[in-house]
Amino acid sequence: MALTNNLWAFVFGILGNIISFVVFLAPVPTFVRICKKKSTEGFQSLPYVSALFSAMLWIYYAMQKDGTAFLLITINAFGCVIETIYIVLFVSYANKKTRISTLKVLGLLNFLGFAAIVLVCELLTKGSTREKVLGGICVGFSVSVFAAPLSIMRVVVRTRSVEFMPFSLSLFLTISAVTWLFYGLAIKDFYVALPNVLGAFLGAVQMILYIIFKYYKTPVAQKTDKSKDVSDHSIDIAKLTTVIPGAVLDSAVHQPPALHNVPETKIQLTEVKSQNMTDPKDQINKDVQKQSQV
């Protein structure tokens, strides 16, 4: 087997499988919460649908490599299984509107889209040409997914808060990207290495931002508006794939309740109390008058 003749490729491939395995399990707490509450709340399904599509693409690409990318198949096969479980759970607990939209995206992207790619590659390309076409598609999809963390980093810079960007996940995603980068270099595969250059860079930027803003005290005015800036999709999206993009976090998917109405409520309560309160001297005079009347 060609892979065993390259010690570094084998080492980085095994490390990449282990780290990616951990990253694939990152959404487990989210789905435990969904199962307990029997509701998907504000979470979205796009990250998991995208992750499944990415894993399917990389398996198909690795199958064209004559066994030299076997470790890509193992981790992405696990990814297909775990992402399918996530999607089934999500659809089971989603409301009707969300369920229908999820199934539409799943059908268009993972069934029709993937089937179209397979048909085009099988009918119109052969050998190294097919490998190049598939590699280009995989790189293009992975790079497009890398745009998701940019929205999260923008929120961090604007709000001066790292609430939506946990350091641990950013660290694991960065390590995973670096590992698969070296794996791609070891097997001399440009299509595996290239997306992870961007992944490693964005992961490093996320950790730097976290260190900068970790102890920054967020002004109240900014803190009340930051939930408006966070939108999902993040996606994450396909954050849990072999070619790991930047973190698109579940906390970003689930938007917290808006806080901008709280000060107004307090003001209203204060006004009500002030209207109901009477001056102590006036109250004493009224009591004296009542006693004199008696």
UniProtKB/Swiss-Prot annotation:
Record field: transmembrane: 8-28, 43-63, 70-90, 105-125, 133-153, 167-187, 193-213
Where in or outside the cell it occurs: the entry states: Cell membrane
UniProt KW keywords: Cell membrane, Membrane, Repeat, Sugar transport, Transmembrane, Transmembrane helix, Transport
Report the residue ranges that make up the MtN3/slv domain in this protein: 10-97, 133-216
The residue ranges flagged as biased composition, category Basic and acidic residues, are 279-294
- Ranges facing Cytoplasmic side: 29-42, 91-104, 154-166, 214-294
Could you state one GO cellular component term attached to this entry? plasma membrane
Q: Where is this region: Disordered?
A: 273-294
- Description of what induces expression: Slightly induced by the fungal pathogen B.cinerea.
Q: Which InterPro entries match?
A: SWEET, SWEET_rpt
Tissue specificity as recorded in UniProt: Expressed at low levels in leaves.
Q: Give any GO molecular function from the UniProt entry.
A: sugar transmembrane transporter activity
Question: Does the keyword field hold Transport?
Answer: yes
- Bilayer topology annotation: Multi-pass membrane protein
Which ranges make up the Extracellular topological domains here?
1-7, 64-69, 126-132, 188-192
Q: Which GO terms describe its biological process?
A: anther dehiscence; callose deposition in cell wall; gibberellic acid transmembrane transport; pollen development; seed growth; sucrose transport
Pfam families from the entry?
Answer: MtN3_slv
Q: Which family does it belong to?
A: Belongs to the SWEET sugar transporter family.
Relate the protein's function as given in its record.
Mediates both low-affinity uptake and efflux of sugar across the plasma membrane. Involved in nurturing the male gametophyte.
Subunit note: Forms heterooligomers with SWEET1, SWEET3, SWEET6, SWEET7, SWEET8, SWEET9, SWEET11 and SWEET17.
Protein name (record): Bidirectional sugar transporter SWEET13
Q: What is the lineage of its organism?
A: Eukaryota, Viridiplantae, Streptophyta, Embryophyta, Tracheophyta
